């Protein structure tokens, strides 16, 4: 049976070795500790005590959508989690750029942005979506370091050869001869690849269009994201009708890992391992493929007793749609900031609920129960338990 642990901080807020739930209950009952975090459950001692610590290794399995982490000692696993990152960041950034550009056009005069790009001013510049994921990796590792006395961090740093993924037999000069060699432009190559016929209805002798399967903002102009369609099928897609065709394989995750792998290692001052070693060790231990198991193997786990993993979900901290246009204009986001915000944890009577939104000028609040039932209550009857700070921890029991 997997054990549940309670994490402990000393009087100065520095991490100690975790204890059992029974010992935590005794300390809380005797007034020797206080609760400072509900999930993962963490207490802080109010008395001086011995600070014996064991060497702890943290294994990190980085990723584009998910992060696996596992902290182990020589005998047992102390913490395990799989973090699910936000997936709508690129779309939200595109929407923000669109609104910013529209705002510039509505003003009487705005100095042009000629030659003042951030990219040319700062070394090590990263795209906002890439920087967000890199900072999310660093943030979750620093959070675990504030909860456990970590001595060593090991990160799996992989380099992906995208051309090798597309064509496993590629070698030598073939790297310099791409699929578009000897073609005038992308459109000419796509039409030739599709044999100058519609990929949907297979018509040839008609007007042909080159269509983006995914938007240019998210899918780019690469040939794999383009498909040949006749004028009729293209109009159907424009009107919102679905047409079946093979969607291209995305290499965003591989590109992302190639960009951030050394930045992540340098930021966390970590040791490095590689994917083929992780795969070999995982097979030797007969463990199923998962992010938490990969992190356990990366941390050099062998026969340590495992703990219940946490599922961590990254949430949006500001929702721009909550601010309504009730006064004839749209004020700045959260200008009238209420004490409670979405995803906060509150107590109503004996029930622990999550905040959905605050309305009626801060007098009422919408709450969501564990069965996703939304209820409406007066805000005066609500007691705050925990602010949502971007990450939501759920213990898998």
Positions of PLM-derived features:
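Short beta-strand-centered aromatic/proline hotspots
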Residues: 344, 351-366
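Short Cys/His-centered divalent metal-binding micro-motifs
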Residues: 202-206, 226-246
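Gly/Thr-rich phosphate-binding beta-strand-loop-beta motif of the actin/hexokinase/Hsp70
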Residues: 54-73
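Charged, flexible boundary elements
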Residues: 19-51, 179
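Substrate-contacting helices/loops that form the catalytic groove of nucleic-acid
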Residues: 51, 72-181, 244-342, 384-397
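Histidine-centered nuclease catalytic patch
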Residues: 199-228
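Glycine- and charge-enriched low-complexity intrinsically disordered segments
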Residues: 62, 367-397
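Short metal-coordination and nucleic-acid-contact micro-motifs, chiefly zinc-binding Cys/His arrays
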Residues: 6, 190-196, 206, 222-226, ...
């Amino acid at each position: 049976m997997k054990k549940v642990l309670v994490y402990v901080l000393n009087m100065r807020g520095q991490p100690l070795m975790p204890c059992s739930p029974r010992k935590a209950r005794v300390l809380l009952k005797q007034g020797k500790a206080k609760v400072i975090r509900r999930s993962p459950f963490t207490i802080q001692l109010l008395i001086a005590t011995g600070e014996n610590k064991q060497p702890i290794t943290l294994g990190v399995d980085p990723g584009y959508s998910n992060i696996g982490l596992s902290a182990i000692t020589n005998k047992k696993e102390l913490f395990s989690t799989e973090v699910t990152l936000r997936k709508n960041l690129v779309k939200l950034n595109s929407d923000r750029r669109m609104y910013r550009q529209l705002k510039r056009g509505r003003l009487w005069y705005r100095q042009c942005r000629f030659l003042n790009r951030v990219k040319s001013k700062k070394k090590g510049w990263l795209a906002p979506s890439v920087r967000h994921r890199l900072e999310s990796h660093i943030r979750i590792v620093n959070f675990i370091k504030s909860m456990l006395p970590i001595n060593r961090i090991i990160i799996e740093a992989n380099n992906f050869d995208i051309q090798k993924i597309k064509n496993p037999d590629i070698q030598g000069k073939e790297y310099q001869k791409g699929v578009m060699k000897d073609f005038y432009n992308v459109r000419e190559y796509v039409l030739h690849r599709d044999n100058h016929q519609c990929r949907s209805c297979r018509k040839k002798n008609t007007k042909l269009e080159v269509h983006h399967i995914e938007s240019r903002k998210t899918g780019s102009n690469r040939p794999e994201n383009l498909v040949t369609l006749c004028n009729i099928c293209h109009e159907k897609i424009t009107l919102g009708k679905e047409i079946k065709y093979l969607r291209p394989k995305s290499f965003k995750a591989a590109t992302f890992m190639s960009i951030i792998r050394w930045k992540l290692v340098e930021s966390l001052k970590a040791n490095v391992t590689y994917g083929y070693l992780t795969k070999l060790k995982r097979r030797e231990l007969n463990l199923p493929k998962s992010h938490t198991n990969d992190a356990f193997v990366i941390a050099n786990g062998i026969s340590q007793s495992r703990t219940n993993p946490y599922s961590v979900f990254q949430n949006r901290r500001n929702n721009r749609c909550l601010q309504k246009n009730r006064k004839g204009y749209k004020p700045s986001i959260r200008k009238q900031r209420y004490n409670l915000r979405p995803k906060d944890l509150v107590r109503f009577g004996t029930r622990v609920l999550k905040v959905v939104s605050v309305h009626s000028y801060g007098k009422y609040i919408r709450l969501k129960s564990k069965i996703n039932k939304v209820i409406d209550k007066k805000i005066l009857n609500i007691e705050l338990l925990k602010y949502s700070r971007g990450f939501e921890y759920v213990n898998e029991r």
